[in-house]
């Protein structure tokens, strides 16, 4: 979710940045996101905006484990089972968003389809997109590539990307985290001319 908020930030305040690293993002079908947002609105009529809907949560995350061998519903996050277990044990991670939170998230994601909004990203802002090629959020790189293409179509020209074989969503705690951190450090050194 953070990568979607980061991309929205780039559209509004990218001119305040010297660069950005976007990790684990995607570009879900617009109709799907719009339908999910509409569902939140309908459910809120009956249950209120503070309701925590398991239906919306399941629709948002249910298919993420598809095609993966896993012990838990959160295995899509990481190949490192110890990290998955830490995530599952953390009450700050294992909660259901309110309808209002989902609605706000879907509204923000829908803004990322608007060329006028994307035009706010500075054309020369250095961007690095990192993703695991087994990350379901990025549709195993297809969604990440669409996100990059949308920015290029908006005239943003300084975009680099790297996809990690077998890696899933949480790259900073993946089994290849040393490689990820080295790539981040290398990109930052290049951008900062160190």
Which ranges hold each PLM region?
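Conserved alpha/beta-hydrolase "acid-adjacent" motif
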Residues: 136-146
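Alpha/beta-hydrolase-fold enzymes
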Residues: 6-92
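Active-site nucleophile elbow and catalytic-triad environment of alpha/beta-hydrolase enzymes
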Residues: 97-119
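Short, proline-enriched alpha-helix->beta-strand connector loops that line the catalytic pocket
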Residues: 121-127, 154-157
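Catalytic nucleophile loop
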Residues: 2-3
